[in-house]
């Protein structure tokens, strides 16, 4: 019971149990939820009892902040974001794909998103919308100081490594998982991102297509 944020948090908290989940929207948008709390619930309960539903696996991301002394890990259903904490200066960082240098950015940060997360922060930053059942990763710079910096679509087998290039004392940077789990990132450390070994499984009750869901819910914003 709740909004998209509640469902995202539950997906991380319950990942080891691999339980199917269904969201009942009590929040604002409810893009990930199946029904609204205002709807009559008897048909929903009947569908669950009669196995009149499908299960949809949603890819997740695993991120690691790798330092000289320790490594901390987290998982995300929507996205992992490299961002600043308390300054307005741009970040200067490099991105490596599968240990090969890809690009260097001056930007407010960068988003690594799943197909589920393609309609969240990634969309606001100009990234593409992707069907939620797809198996891929999106990498979208945030307000890059370049006319050529664009989102890229990656294989789910790719490994992303993000490294800070320039550091000035007093700056604080963070790796943020799904908007609420925050790990500080310091110069000399790197943020490594790959597909998580487990999935979130969502119960799908209604025969509503992905595009219809986009049309109905995104037009409200």
Which residues does each predicted region cover?
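Short glycine-rich anion-binding loops that position phosphate/pyrophosphate groups of nucleotides
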Residues: 3-6, 29, 116-118
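Gly/Ser-rich helix-loop-strand patches that form or flank binding pockets
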Residues: 9, 14-24
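Catalytic core of DAGKc-family lipid kinases
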Residues: 28-108
């Amino acid at each position: 019971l709740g909004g998209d944020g509640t469902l995202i948090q539950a997906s991380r908290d319950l990942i080891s149990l691999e339980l199917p989940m269904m969201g009942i929207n009590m929040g604002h948008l409810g893009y990930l939820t199946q029904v609204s709390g205002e709807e009559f619930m008897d048909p929903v309960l009947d569908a669950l009892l009669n196995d009149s539903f499908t299960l949809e696996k949603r890819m997740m991301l695993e991120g690691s902040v790798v330092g000289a002394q320790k490594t901390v890990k987290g998982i995300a259903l929507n996205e992992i974001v490299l961002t600043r904490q308390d300054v307005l200066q741009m970040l200067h960082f490099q991105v490596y794909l599968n240990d090969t240098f890809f690009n260097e950015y001056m930007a407010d940060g960068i988003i690594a998103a799943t197909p589920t997360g393609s309609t969240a922060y990634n969309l606001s930053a100009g990234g593409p919308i992707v069907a939620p059942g797809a198996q891929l990763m999106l990498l979208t710079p945030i307000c890059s100081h370049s006319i050529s910096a664009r989102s890229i679509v990656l294989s789910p087998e790719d490994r992303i490594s993000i490294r800070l290039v320039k550091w000035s004392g007093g700056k604080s940077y963070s790796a943020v998982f799904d908007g609420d789990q925050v790990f500080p990132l310091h110069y000399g450390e790197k943020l490594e991102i790959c597909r998580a070994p487990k999935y979130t499984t969502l119960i799908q009750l209604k025969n509503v297509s992905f595009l219809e869901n986009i049309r109905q819910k995104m037009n409200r914003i």
